[in-house]
Amino acid sequence: MNKDLAAMRVGYAHQGADGRYVDSDLDADQLIGGWLPLMRLWLEDAVEAGVPEPNAMTLGTVDEHGHPCTRTVLCKGLSTDGVLFFTNYDSDKGRQLEAVPYASVTFTWVPVARQITVRGPVERVSAEVTDEYWHSRPRGSRLGAWASEQSKPIGSRAELDAALLHAAERFPVDVDIPVRPDWGGILIRPAVVEFWQGRANRMHNRIRTSLVDGSWTVERLQP
């Protein structure tokens, strides 16, 4: 093992002058009202702490062989229904989620020593939801979605740049850029949500809430 990597660690002290933790201990009582209020609060805290791209999350899927695949995507909505992101449905992740409609996402906010993992079944959102978000995107992002056949091989960077130029010519500035027919939103409906909070000596706080027979259970896990 690389000795430099083996020696890398963080103490997760996050203590003030009085020796107490700057943030209060995570407790099961904080999830009595459900997973969403605390998740929104932690996301707001990450924003205020200046965490880069606080809505970035690692999305886990499995391919046709059962092999796990992960990548970073951006959360574009949180509601009682679940966690929302958008993608090309014909991309690797889109096809994998169509074949196995279950996913896991993890938000990791290192500067505040917090992490949330959400697992659950997925479904495509309505065309209306997709259209509303699509038209809120910058023009360049919409052109990029048309230019890229996501996850497909391409010969060179020059070919990719040429595809973007072609998309810009196809949709001039005065022309509305329509939603790609194979592009849209995917909603993860939470079945399990785990909140993790770093603490000294690796005695981290872990609280998991799970949907069981229509009701949410809450339990503390050992670190």
Curated annotation (Swiss-Prot):
Subunit structure: Homodimer.
Top class in the EC scheme: oxidoreductase
Organism: Rhodococcus jostii (strain RHA1)
Catalysed reactions, as listed in the record: pyridoxamine 5'-phosphate + O2 + H2O = pyridoxal 5'-phosphate + H2O2 + NH4(+); pyridoxine 5'-phosphate + O2 = pyridoxal 5'-phosphate + H2O2
Residues that bind FMN: 71-76, 86-87, 93, 115, 150-151, 196, 206
PANTHER family named among the record's database cross-references: PYRIDOXINE-5'-PHOSPHATE OXIDASE, PYRIDOXINE-5-PHOSPHATE OXIDASE
Needed co-factor(s): FMN
Name used for this protein in its record: Pyridoxine/pyridoxamine 5'-phosphate oxidase
UniProt-listed Enzyme Commission number(s): 1.4.3.5
SUPFAM superfamilies xrefs: FMN-binding split barrel (SSF50475)
Gene Ontology annotations of biological process type: pyridoxine biosynthetic process
